[in-house]
């Protein structure tokens, strides 16, 4: 009797782990999300931005960050309360 219950518990746990694994994003989806992340820039690393467009670039970057994090939070099932800061 105890062995039967133990086997049932193990089966339930295995099914729970498999269903959770099936809901996770694949490696390709994670890579795509990272490629589209908030740190994307048209400028090569180490370049200096034009100071006259600094505020516009910063504002656009914040908008992209906010959109990215909203999408990431929605995809993970978390509630979005707004960006801190």
From Swiss-Prot:
Tissues expressed in: Expressed exclusively in the medial lobe of female salivary gland. Not detected in female carcass without head and salivary glands. Not detected in male tissues.
Chain positions listed as propeptide in the UniProt record: 24-74
Modified positions (Methionine amide) in chain numbering: 84
UniProt entry keywords in alphabetical sequence: Amidation, Immunity, Neuropeptide, Secreted, Signal, Vasoactive, Vasodilator
Domain of life: Eukaryota
Any one GO BP annotation for this protein: vasodilation
PROSITE patterns: TACHYKININ
Region (Disordered): 26-61
Signal peptide, first to last residue: 1-23
Phenotype on disruption: Extended probing times when mosquitoes are fed on mouse or chicken but not when fed using an artificial membrane feeder. Reduced blood-feeding success, determined as the percentage of engorged mosquitoes after 90 or 120 sec, when fed on mouse or chicken but not when fed using an artificial membrane feeder. No significant effects on blood meal size, fecundity and fertility. Lower blood perfusion during probing and feeding at the bite site. Reduced endothelial permeability enhancement at the site of inoculation in the host. (Microbial infection) RNAi-mediated knockdown results in reduced ability of mosquito saliva to enhance Semliki Forest virus infection in mammalian cells.
Bias (Basic and acidic residues) ranges: 52-61
Subcellular location: Secreted
Cellular component GO terms, alphabetical: extracellular region
InterPro entries listed in its UniProt record: Tachy_Neuro_lke_CS (IPR013055)
Assigned protein family: Belongs to the tachykinin family.
Biological role: Vasodilatory peptide. Facilitates mosquito blood feeding on vertebrate host. Induces nitric oxide (NO) release in blood vessels through the activation of the nitric oxide synthase (NOS3). Enhances endothelial permeability and induces edema at the site of inoculation in the host. Induces host smooth muscle contraction. Down-regulates production of Th1 cytokines, such as IL2 and IFN-gamma (IFNG), in mouse splenocytes. Up-regulates production of Th2 cytokines, such as IL4 and IL10, in mouse splenocytes.
Name of the protein described by the UniProt record: Prosialokinin
Native organism: Aedes aegypti
